[in-house]
């Protein structure tokens, strides 16, 4: 197989937005973790929350995709010149020849969690402004990214827990090798939600202090 070129890459996390911020945090030993103060969660643990996600706005035409996961996606796409390289690839290969392969565990499940709080007390119906397909659904991540760039080709979301963002690279490489696409947007996005926080707490895997996953005396992951 012909070696593939990674022509652009970026990272956004609790360490910061973009490669420079991430590198600086790593070199200075700043973790980005803080005591949990997310939503209504009451857990004695530390979490990594990306700053300013809630301030990110999606284009009006993509309002149905509005959720924290897709807001973080846009933040990442518009960092380190990544979106510019995507648009260059589209100009070179065409809208149908650039694929989207993104991994996620929970996608926009927070929207469902919040919607359940607003169910109709009589019928139990979810609110009319809740859009499952374009927020909670795992594919919403890939569909949003495809729509964001006006792409018309292959798009795939892989949701296999922690391996999701590794498997997408293999999936994209296979499609390029088969000649079905010429370039691909590859990566992974996950945002905080109640399911993840309470889920790991129920498994007794959270820690009341900043996690030390490789420490012999660790008390959580």
Regions found by a protein language model. Give the residues of each.
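A short local structural element in Rossmann-fold oxidoreductases
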Residues: 197
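Active-site-proximal alpha-helical scaffold in enzymes
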Residues: 83, 138-142, 146-149, 154-188
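Conserved "HGTGT" condensation-loop signature of ketosynthase/thiolase-family condensing enzymes
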Residues: 1-153, 193, 201-220
């Amino acid at each position: 197989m012909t070696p593939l070129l990674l022509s652009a890459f970026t990272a956004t996390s609790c360490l910061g937005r973009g490669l420079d911020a991430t590198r600086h945090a790593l070199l200075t030993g700043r973790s980005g973790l803080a005591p949990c103060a997310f939503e209504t969660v009451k857990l004695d643990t530390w979490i990594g929350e990306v700053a300013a996600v809630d301030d990110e706005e999606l284009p009006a035409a993509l309002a149905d995709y509005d959720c924290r996961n897709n807001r973080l996606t846009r933040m990442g796409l518009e960092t380190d010149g990544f979106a510019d390289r995507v648009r260059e690839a589209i100009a070179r290969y065409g809208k149908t020849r650039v694929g989207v392969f993104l991994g996620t565990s929970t996608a926009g499940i927070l929207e469902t969690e919040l919607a359940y709080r607003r169910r109709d007390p009589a019928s139990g119906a979810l609110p009319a402004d809740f859009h499952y397909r374009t927020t909670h659904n795992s594919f919403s991540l890939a569909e949003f990214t495809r729509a964001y760039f006006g792409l018309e080709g292959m798009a795939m979301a892989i949701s296999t827990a922690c391996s999701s963002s590794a498997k997408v690279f293999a999936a994209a490489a296979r499609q390029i090798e088969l000649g079905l696409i010429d370039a691909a947007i590859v990566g992974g996005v996950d945002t905080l939600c109640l399911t993840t926080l309470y889920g790991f707490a129920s498994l007794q895997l959270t820690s009341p202090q900043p996690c030390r996953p490789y420490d012999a005396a660790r008390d959580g992951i």
